[in-house]
Amino acid sequence: MDRGTLATKHANVYAIGDVTTIPIPGRWRPDVPLILPKAGVFAHGQALVVAQRIAAEISGAQPDVKFCADGYCMLEAGEDLAGFAFGNFFAEPSPDVRLRKLGRAWHIGKVLFERWWLAPFGIRRELLGATIKLGGKAYGVPVVL
């Protein structure tokens, strides 16, 4: 499977989510390579890439979008506090993942994201998405929903 296009060796077949084993830079142990974690953030990003590639192919265009392995995770700490880890898992020589300081804002962001994710399509979901994007801009976090 190509880690950027997510295309398999079979024509017109892509792989996303937990069925993938995508090597990333670095080693777990000398004899064990690192692989991209099995996390929803990566499956979501992979689905967006594959959908855009299929749409381009159907319309006769050459697809150029690639999966970049940028990932993030909110880390709940209790008492309405959370941390935020994010990074580029394809960075060389090893994944570049950073952890932001615990704070209430990350907890609020997590709650908003959960509400957005579970909301039916409509004005409420759009407003939640706009709020998340605004918060992302304020905190220097790229947001792709």
Feature map (PLM): residue ranges:
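Internal hydrophobic alpha-helix adjacent to the cofactor/substrate pocket in enzyme cavities
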Residues: 39-69
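FAD-binding beta-loop-beta segment adjacent to the flavin cofactor pocket
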Residues: 1-15, 77-95
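A broadly tuned preference for mixed-charge, low-complexity surface segments
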Residues: 13-31, 69, 125-144
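C-terminal auxiliary extensions adjacent to catalytic cores
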Residues: 84-145
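Short C-terminal domain-edge/linker segments immediately following a structured domain
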Residues: 7, 44-49, 104-109
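Short, low-complexity, polar/charged sequence segments that are solvent-exposed and flexible
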Residues: 18, 33-36, 61, 92-96
